[in-house]
Structure formats: C-alpha cells, structure tokens
C-alpha cells in the first residue's frame, strides 16, 4: 500500500490486482481510509484511495452539533473545509500521481464517512 501525505491528511492507495493501466485508472475514493488497510480491501481493476481522517466527528459533519451522549465529543461541522481540501489539494494530486480517470471515480465511506461523501 502506498502512503502519501497530501494537504493535512494521510492518504493510503492500494493498486488493483491487475496493476495500474498505462492510460487512466478508475478509482474508488473512501473516507475513513484506514479501513482499506484494516479490512485488507482489494479490487480487480480500480485504485482504492483512502483519506485518513484527522478528526472524523469534525470533518465528516456538515454543521456543529452537541454530542448525543455525555462524555463524547461534539460534532465539529467542518465538512465544507474538508471538501475544499479534498477537491482543491488532495484529489488533483492523486489524479496526477496515479493517472486517475475522473469519469470513473466513485466516492464513498462508512457511517459519517458515507454522509460526508453525499
């Protein structure tokens, strides 16, 4: 797995089992990027790219909100800032680094990471 630091985030990239194409490569971009490594995720043809969160309760929520349970952190509401960094710094660097095909790019995540991807 390739590990990069782009913007303020750690990025993990796992190449397809068939290797990178000579032309453009399809990709799946995932929030909670550490799951690619933890779950040993693989694909046959797409590059898996995971963005590791700095603070998922802040970065993956669209507005600030108090915690649901006492003793747990509040939701920070920094999704707009996270998306600006993703779109303006991280994604362009990944497109250049791995020749990603912007027409074949999926974006998703798990739980709050999925909310952030909508």
Model region roles, listed by residue range:
Residues 1-118:
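Non-catalytic cap/lid and distal C-terminal segments of serine-dependent acyl enzymes
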């Amino acid at each position: 797995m390739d590990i990069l630091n782009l913007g303020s985030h750690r990025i993990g990239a796992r190449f397809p089992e068939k290797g990178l194409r000579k032309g453009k490569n399809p990709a799946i971009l995932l929030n909670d990027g550490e799951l690619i490594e933890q779950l040993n995720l693989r694909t046959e043809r797409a590059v898996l790219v995971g963005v590791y969160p700095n603070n998922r309760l802040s970065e993956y929520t669209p507005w600030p909100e108090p915690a649901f349970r006492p003793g747990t952190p509040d939701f920070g509401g920094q999704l707009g800032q996270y998306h600006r960094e993703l779109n303006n710094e991280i994604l362009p660097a990944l497109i250049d680094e791995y020749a990603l095909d912007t027409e074949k790019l999926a974006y998703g995540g798990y739980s709050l990471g999925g909310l952030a991807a909508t």
